[in-house]
């Protein structure tokens, strides 16, 4: 199933349209609708209210601007790493090899990788040869277009099939990537959208992992299915699948262990969990969401390749873009993996977690000409 971006939507329990867009991009599809989406109000059209379903307010311009400002500030930590000082490299407005070489260096240093950087630069060099880039404005416009062309195919909404009860999302990733925090933030968004949510504490190996997830469950008023430390993770998640079905849960978020991705036993364990989930529902898990620490750079790309090969990843969350990461790894993953990037995280607070939008991300990286110098 094709899945993508979204600040999740959800559901008021009543018959609804056969297909509706909810909130920041989460799409709900159902052959026999069980729920009608309630919108977060982030970058979405407002649906007309029915007598028993009040309209949900759209995201205000101030909210949109607030997220964009935080995104730009966190990605750049001051000056735009990609376009700062470019005006000084374009004497008389002439775009030459020196300017393109500088851009190439910046892209590689920002973890875009050689392959992705070559793809971007080849597009720009061909335009220079055709004399289409004769000033800084034209260069920035072409650069923006090249980056968006890479990212847009990965900016896909997350699809929740309402005929799947529960819609089971398996969260995977190495220790320290931010899986449990991501689960907590997703649970919060789902609750805001009136989804009935349950968490499964499948990381039974890491010290205090179960307790950490239970704290998120209490914070969001969401039930957590857990067993003791050292319990069989597959058994925990199987129990959670049964409980979610019995309690008519909309979405189940399953945490997993995250020991080093180079350990074969971890991948085998995750494969076992997938098999066990499919015994309860042959179509489960309905989403395999990989959480990556963006500050890991090219190592995050290697993690994505290994997890995808082993498990068939259907969506990615990139966390910690507020740290040392400059965002280039987002371009590398979109270019080389061509997997949907669901969400990005730029901080610890719930407001620092949002759906991935290609245009906003690129605009946060590239300052307008008036600010470049």
Regions found by a protein language model. Name each.
Residues 115, 148-373:
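P-loop/Walker A NTP-binding module and the surrounding RecA-like catalytic core of P-loop NTPases
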């Amino acid at each position: 199933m094709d899945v993508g971006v979204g600040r999740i939507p959800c559901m008021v329990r009543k018959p609804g349209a056969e297909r509706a867009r909810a909130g920041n991009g989460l799409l709900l599809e159902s052959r026999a609708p069980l729920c009608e989406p309630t919108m977060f109000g982030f970058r979405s059209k407002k649906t007309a209210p029915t007598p028993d379903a009040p309209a949900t307010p759209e995201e205000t311009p101030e909210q949109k601007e607030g997220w964009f400002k935080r995104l730009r500030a966190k990605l750049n930590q001051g000056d735009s790493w990609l376009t700062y000082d470019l005006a000084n490299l374009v004497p008389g407005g002439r775009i030459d090899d020196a300017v393109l070489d500088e851009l190439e260096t910046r892209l590689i240093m920002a973890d875009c990788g050689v392959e992705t950087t070559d793809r971007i630069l080849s597009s720009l060099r061909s335009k220079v040869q055709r004399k289409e880039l004769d000033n800084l404005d034209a260069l920035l416009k072409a650069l923006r277009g090249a980056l968006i062309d890479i990212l847009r195919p990965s900016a896909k909404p997350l699809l929740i099939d309402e005929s799947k009860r529960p819609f089971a999302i398996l969260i995977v990733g190495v220790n320290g990537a931010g899986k449990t925090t991501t689960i907590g933030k997703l649970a919060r968004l789902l609750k805001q959208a009136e989804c009935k949510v349950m968490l499964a504490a499948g990381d039974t190996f890491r010290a205090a992992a179960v307790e950490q997830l239970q704290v998120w469950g209490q914070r969001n008023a969401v039930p957590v299915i857990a067993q003791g430390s050292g319990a069989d993770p597959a058994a925990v998640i199987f129990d959670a699948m049964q409980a979610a079905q019995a309690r008519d849960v909309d979405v189940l978020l399953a945490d997993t262990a995250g020991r080093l991705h180079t350990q074969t036993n971890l991948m085998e364990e995750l494969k076992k969990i997938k098999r066990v989930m499919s015994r309860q529902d042959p179509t489960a898990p309905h989403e395999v969401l990989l959480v990556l620490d963006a500050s890991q750079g090219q190592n995050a790309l290697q993690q994505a390749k290994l997890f995808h090969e082993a498990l068939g990843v259907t969506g990615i969350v990139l966390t910690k873009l507020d740290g040392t990461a400059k965002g280039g790894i987002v371009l590398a993953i979109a270019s080389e993996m061509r997997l949907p990037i669901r969400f990005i995280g730029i901080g610890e607070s719930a407001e620092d977690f949002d759906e991935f939008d290609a245009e906003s991300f690129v605009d946060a990286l590239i300052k307008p000409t008036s600010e470049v110098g």
